[in-house]
Amino acid sequence: MKTLPQRNRTTTAILLIAAGLFMAVAAPLLLQSALDATLHALVEEAAANPQHASGPNLVAISFPLWRALIFVVGAASIAIAYPLSRGADWTWPAALACLAVPAIGGMAMTLPYVARVGDTFPPSMIVTLVGLMAYFGVLLLRTDRGKKGIDVLVFTLLGVVTTLGFVLGLGGLGQFMARPERPLLLGAKIAALSLSGPVSGISMALTYAAIPLLAARRRAGWWLGLIGSTSIFAANLPTFVISRASYYLMGAAAGLLLAATLLVPAVKSRLLGSHTT
């Protein structure tokens, strides 16, 4: 970070403080609004269809957890702004890890909102957009890394796969819990869901962990990104073939695209620098 011009460091620090204040003050209110509307729609849906009975409980747990996590990383973003402005190397990976959370969490809350409410603009989307602007701002202000296009592509795909991993993991869990034949794995569909859901959740953790590690040019980050992306691809492609649900295809396609990108030698060399061997 010390090779980065002071002006860029100061701008990045200001961006972190602004995003952190938003996450700590405005985001909880916006996410509460999204939670209320989504829960209301899910309760009505569950009353009409018992197979959706798990939806309200899963949302009532996952949405507040995302809201709390976004609040905490907002405070963390403010805390690391000063050492980042002074050029501490550890702060840039930490900043990306923090700013990925509102982008991922906001989108993870937006997708159920759009699917269940759908007639108004999702308040959680504002959180996603603010997170993305700050995330890309921090990426683009790092002018001392060169070839920023590769960074933007890879770190965007990591965020997309992480988001889909959470959504698919939670959705698979909900569908599995709602089946009256559980815990028996009767039929190909429920058996596929019992695998793809947990694999997607684990893949989410791996691809998220890859963000700060790759920002620090750690080889472990490349491996975590590759393992997470190939796992979500391998688990969700058969589930799509069996269920014909498009969101499993989205997960498989995003995983394949990330894995293929990471395997390009020029991309790997760019991400890891001297740590390619």
Residue ranges and their predicted role:
Residues 1-277:
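Topology signature of small-to-medium multi-pass alpha-helical membrane proteins
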